[in-house]
């Protein structure tokens, strides 16, 4: 039984943000509740006065649900990556067949309140249109994050460790994570839930053949899901997966036949073997944008 609550953000404005913790009720005692606090914020690049906001149980339902209402929230952005700490525990007990087992130990983990979404053909970050620009790294190291921040570059990576995800979140570096073959859908959901704990993860890129319905978004409430399309792929509306928020288009060095769907964001990625520094490769994103300008505006550019 997985007894780790899932955190997600509800309504969020400059005045207040609502943070929720949820856990399936199956197998729990009737009086079980999630209780705890949201503590913070803290930020490497700004001084703050931390507060403690209590999680309040929201009553009966198919899941346990607790809510923390954060006044004057400090949102996570690459410029100011504000982080909070969540402390939660399961009050009551776990029903174990014919007896009642003690509740599991308290959970404490970092959390960022980030506003990220799509509208039309654009990505929005912190309620503003945001064009994502970044570089691909085959074997990213934690030391790369400083260079990425200095270059205002996102990173496109695979299989990041928990330590890398935490450092990127503290440093303010946006990540696009490509997921390989996950096999069973349950494994995919677990990996999306792991990535979704960190505000640095903006997009998870899934293969276009992933046999998932729109419900897979429930495992990725805090990030965007991108459908990966190869160079030259046709994209009639019927070929777009129901779970996709974004299309991730891998293009060749002289690609010119991209047809941008009118109703959703497209991020263009041009792979390169150039062993340049992150700052130089980040500047290449501007060249890619210029090359693709006759085709229209894209939601992001990666090299």
Question: Where do the model's predicted regions map?
Answer:
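Secreted/periplasmic carbohydrate-active enzymes, especially glycoside hydrolases
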Residues: 1-303
């Amino acid at each position: 039984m997985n007894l780790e609550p899932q955190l997600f953000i509800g309504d969020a404005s400059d005045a207040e943000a609502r943070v929720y913790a949820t856990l399936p009720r199956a197998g729990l005692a009737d009086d079980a509740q999630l209780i705890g606090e949201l503590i913070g914020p803290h930020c490497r690049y700004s001084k703050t006065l931390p507060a403690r906001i209590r999680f309040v149980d929201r009553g009966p339902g198919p899941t346990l649900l607790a809510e923390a209402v954060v006044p004057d929230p400090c949102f996570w952005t690459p410029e100011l990556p504000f982080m909070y700490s969540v402390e939660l525990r399961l009050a009551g007990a776990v029903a174990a067949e014919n007896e009642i087992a003690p509740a599991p130990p308290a959970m404490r983990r970092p959390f960022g309140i980030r506003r990220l979404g799509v509208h039309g053909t654009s990505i929005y970050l912190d309620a503003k249109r945001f064009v994502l620009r970044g570089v691909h790294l085959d074997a990213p190291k934690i030391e790369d994050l400083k260079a990425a921040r200095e270059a205002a570059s996102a990173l496109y990576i695979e299989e990041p460790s928990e330590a890398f995800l935490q450092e990127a979140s503290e440093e303010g570096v946006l990540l696009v994570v490509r997921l390989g073959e996950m096999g069973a859908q349950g494994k995919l959901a677990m990996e999306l839930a792991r990535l979704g704990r960190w505000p640095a993860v903006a997009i998870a890129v899934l293969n276009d053949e992933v046999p998932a319905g729109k419900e897979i978004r429930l495992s990725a409430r805090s990030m965007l899901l991108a459908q990966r399309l190869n160079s030259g792929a046709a994209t009639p509306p019927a070929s777009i997966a129901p779970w996709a928020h974004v299309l991730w288009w891998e293009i060749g060095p002289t690609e010119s036949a991209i047809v941008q769907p009118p109703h959703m964001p497209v991020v263009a990625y041009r792979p390169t073997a150039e062993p340049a520094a992150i700052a130089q490769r980040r500047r290449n994103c501007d060249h890619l944008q210029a090359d693709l300008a006759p085709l229209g505006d894209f939601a992001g550019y990666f090299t």
